[in-house]
Each structure stands twice: as structure tokens, then as C-alpha cells.
């Protein structure tokens, strides 16, 4: 039902401030789920089981991090038919993020710009929300995305990632290390060759210790930017192979603006998502696939606004895909549309 109603609701939602509309929509989904109306929320998605990183995914279409930063809407979002859900980014301590306004629509380009800045309630509150979710209890695949606090010096970023990894590990199907948001100062420096090598080495050591402690191996994946040249992609590929990382998510938002030049809000600071990042994301996926082969699975995200776009990511070398901005423009029916495209 919601699939049919979304085109009617979108003009109302787009008349609101983007961040207000975001919270309004999530709260309405949560209310509908609490009232037992889950069957009216999303379309049925036929099972397409596949095993990636040792995890059994019921279908290959997931929710990207950023939509539910605090893990407060997991069960309602799970009713939309996703094969997996990723929540966060969470940091060790609560932080407000950047001042509002910090999210902007570019409808002519089916795009968003955000400079949220990892606003979240901190890892302890995050874990309480995750523990309360029935999705996790029922065996749903749940990725937990971790980052660093804005006031943590980049030289000590590893401390924040270690703290979050240790806290979320028992509750995660997999953990994503986000080093690619453009909205935390200097964060993307961690994609540099020496910085990345040091970070991944430390996190892999902690992962093995936690696996021994909890008697359960939780994959750790890296989320990277689309704004990388061939040498940078090669360096990242080498690091992923050298440290035997479990997976990589390609990609985060872009800081490039050529595709939206002249549009209202195009010059706002922040990360650009949606249609304009589609080709850049797919380029990174294709390049990584050539470097990694089958050794490191790729999760493709960026500019998926139709089933054929999800198919592009898989054809370029991704094993799974994630959605975010496409949901804003197309509504929840996009989940089933992408799943159908990947079943063909």
C-alpha cells in the first residue's frame, strides 16, 4: 500500500525541510509497524539467498548507513523487504553534528547534499536500541557502522574505532569502518596508504581478539569514497588484500559538483548522493573488482534509483547493493524493484 501512496505523499514531504521530512517519515513508519501494519508498508520481496562474508543474506538489497543513525527504526525499516540493514554511523560519544540546515534536495538531479557530521547519541545509546530490535533477534542481517568523534584528533582516530568496534561487536552481523565521510574534518586522510595500513592492522588484530573472546567471528568491512584516482584505488585494494579484509563498501558520497553545476544548493558544502554519484561509484567498484577478484567481497552503493542501476553494480563486480537516496526519490517500492532486477 505504501508503495502506491508514496508518489502522492512525496510532494508533501518535499515541501518540508529535508531533515524534518526525514524524521517525520521514519516516525510514521515506526508508528505503522507498532500498530501491526507491517504488511502495508513494503512490497513482498521473493527470497534470493546468497552467502557473502560467511553471512546468509535472504536477498542482496540492503539499506545503506545514514538513514537510521541511532538504530532507532530497525524493525520498521526491516518491514520494507531489505535483505540486510546497516545503521549508524555511531561514534564513541554523543555529538550534535553540524549546524542546520545540513541537508539539501536537488530534485532536478535526483540528488541530496548532506553535511550532517555524524550526529548521533553515542555508542552506548546505539547499543541499547540495537538490543531492543526484534529484527536482530529474528536473525535479520544487521550491519553496524562506526566512526570517530569530530573532536578526536585524526592521529588518535584509531582509538575511537577500537572503542566502537569493541562495543558493537557482540551485536553485529558485520561492522563497517567508515573512513570516507566528507563531513568530518580530515577523516578521508585515513584512506592514505600509510594511515590505512596502520588502521586496518590494528582493527584486524582487535577483531581476532574479539572473535576469540565472544566465540563468534564478525566480519569487518571498509567504506570508501568515490573521489579516488587509480593510484589511490590500487593502494586501497592492496591494503584490503594484505590485511585480508572481509569486505569493502563502494562508495560513500562525493564532493564533486560538475554534475549539478548551476542547480539550487549545488554549492552547499557536504557529500553529494543520488544520481550524480552513480557512475563514479560504479567506476570504483569495477576497478576494485579487477584488483580484488573474489578475495574481498564488494557491496555496491551510490546512485541506485532503479532496478537497472542495481544490476549495473552487480555487473561491475559487487555481490550486494545498498540503497539510500533512491528511497527518498522513489519510495520503498524501489527495494522490490531492485530485487526483481537482480533475480533476472
Swiss-Prot record:
Record pathway: Pyrimidine metabolism; UMP biosynthesis via de novo pathway; orotate from (S)-dihydroorotate (quinone route): step 1/1
Record flagged with keyword Oxidoreductase: yes
Record: residues binding substrate: 69, 114-118, 178, 183, 252-253
Co-factor binding details: Binds 1 FMN per subunit.
Topology of this chain in the membrane: Peripheral membrane protein
Gene Ontology CC, one term: cytoplasm
Cofactor(s) demanded: FMN
Pfam families, alphabetized: DHO_dh
InterPro entries referenced in this protein's UniProt entry, alphabetically: Aldolase_TIM, DHO_dehydrogenase, Dihydroorotate_DH_1_2, Dihydroorotate_DH_2, Dihydroorotate_DH_cat, Dihydroorotate_DH_CS
GO terms assigned for molecular function: dihydroorotate dehydrogenase (quinone) activity
Record GO biological process: 'de novo' pyrimidine nucleobase biosynthetic process; 'de novo' UMP biosynthetic process
Cell location: Cell membrane
Entry-linked PANTHER family: DIHYDROOROTATE DEHYDROGENASE (QUINONE), MITOCHONDRIAL, DIHYDROOROTATE DEHYDROGENASE (QUINONE), MITOCHONDRIAL-RELATED
Function: Catalyzes the conversion of dihydroorotate to orotate with quinone as electron acceptor.
Protein known as: Dihydroorotate dehydrogenase (quinone)
Organism (species): Ralstonia nicotianae (strain ATCC BAA-1114 / GMI1000) (Ralstonia solanacearum)
Amino acid at each position: 500500500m505504501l508503495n502506491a501512496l508514496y508518489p502522492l505523499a512525496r510532494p508533501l514531504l518535499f515541501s518540508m525541510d529535508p531533515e524534518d521530512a526525514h524524521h517525520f517519515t521514519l516516525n510514521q513508519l515506526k508508528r505503522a509497524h507498532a500498530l501491526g501494519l507491517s504488511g502495508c508498508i513494503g512490497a513482498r520481496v521473493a527470497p534470493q539467498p546468497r552467502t557473502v562474508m560467511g553471512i546468509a543474506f535472504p536477498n542482496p538489497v540492503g539499506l545503506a548507513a545514514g538513514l537510521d543513525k541511532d538504530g532507532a527504526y530497525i524493525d520498521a525499516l526491516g518491514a520494507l523487504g531489505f535483505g540486510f540493514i546497516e545503521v549508524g554511523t555511531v561514534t564513541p560519544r554523543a555529538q550534535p553534528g553540524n549546524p542546520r540546515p545540513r541537508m539539501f534536495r536537488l530534485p532536478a538531479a535526483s540528488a541530496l547534499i548532506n553535511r550532517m557530521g555524524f550526529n548521533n547519541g553515542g555508542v552506548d545509546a546505539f547499543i541499547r536500541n540495537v538490543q531492543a530490535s526484534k529484527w536482530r533477534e529474528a536473525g535479520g542481517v544487521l550491519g553496524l557502522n562506526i566512526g570517530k568523534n569530530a573532536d578526536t584528533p585524526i592521529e588518535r582516530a584509531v582509538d575511537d574505532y577500537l572503542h566502537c568496534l569493541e562495543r558493537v561487536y557482540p551485536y553485529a552481523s558485520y561492522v563497517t569502518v567508515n573512513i570516507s565521510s566528507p563531513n568530518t574534518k580530515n577523516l578521508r586522510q585515513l584512506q592514505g596508504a600509510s594511515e590505512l595500513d596502520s588502521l586496518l592492522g590494528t582493527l584486524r588484530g582487535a577483531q581476532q581478539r574479539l572473535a576469540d573472546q565472544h566465540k563468534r567471528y564478525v566480519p569487518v568491512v571498509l567504506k570508501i569514497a568515490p573521489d579516488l584516482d587509480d593510484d589511490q584505488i590500487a593502494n586501497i585494494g592492496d591494503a584490503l588484500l594484505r590485511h585480508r579484509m572481509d569486505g569493502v563498501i563502494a562508495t560513500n558520497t562525493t564532493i564533486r559538483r560538475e554534475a549539478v553545476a548551476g542547480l539550487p544548493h549545488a554549492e552547499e558544502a557536504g557529500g553529494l548522493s543520488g544520481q550524480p554519484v552513480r557512475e563514479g561509484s560504479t567506476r570504483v567498484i569495477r576497478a576494485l573488482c579487477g584488483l580484488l577478484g573474489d578475495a574481498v567481497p564488494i557491496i555496491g552503493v551510490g546512485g541506485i534509483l532503479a532496478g537497472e542501476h542495481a544490476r549495473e553494480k552487480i555487473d561491475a563486480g559487487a555481490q550486494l547493493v545498498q540503497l539510500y537516496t533512491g528511497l527518498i526519490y522513489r519510495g520503498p517500492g524501489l527495494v522490490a524493484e531492485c530485487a526483481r532486477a537482480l533475480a533476472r
